[in-house]
């Protein structure tokens, strides 16, 4: 299978459980299909302010009924128009200090038990609900987590907390489905042994995972999906002219 994909993050910010528009996505998927596109990366959680049952103390009880119903429609359309979905389930936006629930998300990611609640009450139900669909091909555990670590407005959290979430979620997804796992890293410097370390390498994720709740051998990403922008060229080169060794 050859993917010819696009980034189609949202129609309306926080579509799922919020302002989901069936007609928009139907028209969009039809246009993609007619243009020879067969895959789309979609943010099914944009910043966690809509569709999520999260308390101020970071306790996570799951997604709303509306969120699941909107996703039911999305995956129905994906099958109708043969669009393979990469579902992004978190972003640095969750942690930005202008968002309603930013402190709750920061607490969740820094509290191991509450991270487990997010995995148990959202990640696992997600892959169990849609994992049998031929058109649910991957989960992107976070969009550009680099900014959570680097930016004051996102809390400048430690990589350890993020890595522990990725390790737990990846292990849970692999234990419950055949859906692939990735993290949409914002910069190659955090996805490279020769720069500032590969924060999502197999060894890194399996090292930070403790206890016996998760199978360590399942804590890995299936592929890398690092982002690239033109402003990066002077620092890290052009990806299509560099080798993996470079």
Predicted feature residues:
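Long, structured stretches of catalytic cores involved in phosphate-ester chemistry, encompassing
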Residues: 240-242
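Active-site mouth of glycoside hydrolases
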Residues: 1-235, 244-245
């Amino acid at each position: 299978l050859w993917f010819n994909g696009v980034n189609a993050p949202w129609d309306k910010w926080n579509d799922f459980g919020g302002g989901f528009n069936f007609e928009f996505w139907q028209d969009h998927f039809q246009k993609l299909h007619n243009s020879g596109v067969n895959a789309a990366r979609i943010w099914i959680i944009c910043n966690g302010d809509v569709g999520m049952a999260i308390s101020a103390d970071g306790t996570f009880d799951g997604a709303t009924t509306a969120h699941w119903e909107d996703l039911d429609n999305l995956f129905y359309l994906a099958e109708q128009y043969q669009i393979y979905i990469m579902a992004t389930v978190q972003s640095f936006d969750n942690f930005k200090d202008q968002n309603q629930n930013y402190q709750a998300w920061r607490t969740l990611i820094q509290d191991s038990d509450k991270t487990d609640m997010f995995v148990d009450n959202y990640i696992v139900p997600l892959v169990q609900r849609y994992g049998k669909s031929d058109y649910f091909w991957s989960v992107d555990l976070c969009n550009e987590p680099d900014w959570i670590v680097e930016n004051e407005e996102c809390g400048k959290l430690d990589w350890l907390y993020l890595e522990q979430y990725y390790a737990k979620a990846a292990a849970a997804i692999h234990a419950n489905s055949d859906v692939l796992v990735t993290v949409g890293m914002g910069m190659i410097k955090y996805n490279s042994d020769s720069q500032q370390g590969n924060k999502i390498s197999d060894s890194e994720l399996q090292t930070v995972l403790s206890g016996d709740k998760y199978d360590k051998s399942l804590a890995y990403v299936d592929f890398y999906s690092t982002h690239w922008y033109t402003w990066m060229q002077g620092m890290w080169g052009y990806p299509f002219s560099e080798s993996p060794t470079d």
